[in-house]
């Protein structure tokens, strides 16, 4: 692009947040229904949700760049690309690759110095967490993504990678799909020492208390993780990763006694 874009429409929460992180937040003119951080996004027009894009509302913003999540939104944006509007697609594959995306956005938007600073700080913290918590621990972990139906994650997902980074063993690590539906008997057989859920509501884990034979229940290791931090591809994810690592480390301390 000859000049850095000045009117950006962001269609996914993690990109909205990254734009502010790298110093381009003042150019965001519209976003999606789920973007709620930082607080400055509150008054912005909303032109999409996780299922669809309001093309008319998007075009009304006269954007010179649209940023989107490739795996979830590329098909929906075909009409936008046909109109010649540039689209930046995000698809971080692991924690380290997020820094590359920050730099790519910074290069595109003319804020590379700020993006480099943020990416370097993020990688330094990621390395510190890996050094502190990365040693494998004798802790089996079940991550409850949703209930009901009982749904978990394999190791290719953001939460799955976090469990691995923290040295835990995800009991659904090798599932054939990223977000497998799980039978209760599978969890009981695996007998995890820690059960996690991406939620702020303690009620989402209450159903486990009836299964008192589970190590996680015996040890009161039913832990909530902030979903807006862990499930979004941003530097804030490391706040949740650190919380997750602490939970695994504490469970490992009990296990090794």
Please provide the spans of the model-predicted regions.
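Short, structured coil segments at secondary-structure junctions
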Residues: 24, 43, 82-84, 166, ...
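Short secondary-structure boundary segments
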Residues: 12, 70, 145, 175, ...
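A ligand-binding cleft/hinge motif common to bilobed small-molecule-binding domains
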Residues: 72-82, 194-214
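Short helices/loops that flank or line small-molecule/ion binding pockets
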Residues: 55-62, 83, 181-191
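Extracytoplasmic substrate-binding proteins
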Residues: 7, 64-65, 75-151, 169-174, ...
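Short, low-complexity disordered leader/linker segments with a strong preference
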Residues: 1-4
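His/Asp/Glu-enriched short active-site or ligand-binding loop at hydrolase and phosphoryl-transfer sites
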Residues: 32, 156-179, 199, 223-224
């Amino acid at each position: 692009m000859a000049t850095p874009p000045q009117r950006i429409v962001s269609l996914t929460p993690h990109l909205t947040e990254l734009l502010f992180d790298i110093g381009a937040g003042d150019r965001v003119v519209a976003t999606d229904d789920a973007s709620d951080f930082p607080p400055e996004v509150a008054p912005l027009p909303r032109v999409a949700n996780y299922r669809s894009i309001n093309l008319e509302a998007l075009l009304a913003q006269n954007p010179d760049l649209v940023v989107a999540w490739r795996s979830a939104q590329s098909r929906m944006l075909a009409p936008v690309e046909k109109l010649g509007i540039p689209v930046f697609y995000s698809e971080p594959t692991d924690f380290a690759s997020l820094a590359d995306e920050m730099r790519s956005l910074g290069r595109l938007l003319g804020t590379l110095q700020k993006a480099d600073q943020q990416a370097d700080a993020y990688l330094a913290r990621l390395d510190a967490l890996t050094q502190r918590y990365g040693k494998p621990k004798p802790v089996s972990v079940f991550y409850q993504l949703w209930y009901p139906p009982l749904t978990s994650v394999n190791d290719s997902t953001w939460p799955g990678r976090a469990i691995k980074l923290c040295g835990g063993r995800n009991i659904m690590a090798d599932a054939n799909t990223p977000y497998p539906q799980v039978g209760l008997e599978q969890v009981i057989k695996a007998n995890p020492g820690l059960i996690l859920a991406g939620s702020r509501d303690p009620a989402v884990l209450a159903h486990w208390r009836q299964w008192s034979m589970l190590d996680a229940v015996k040890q009161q290791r039913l832990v909530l993780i902030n979903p807006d931090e862990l499930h979004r591809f941003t530097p804030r994810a490391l706040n949740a990763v650190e919380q997750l690592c602490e939970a695994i480390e504490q469970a490992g301390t009990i296990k090794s006694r």
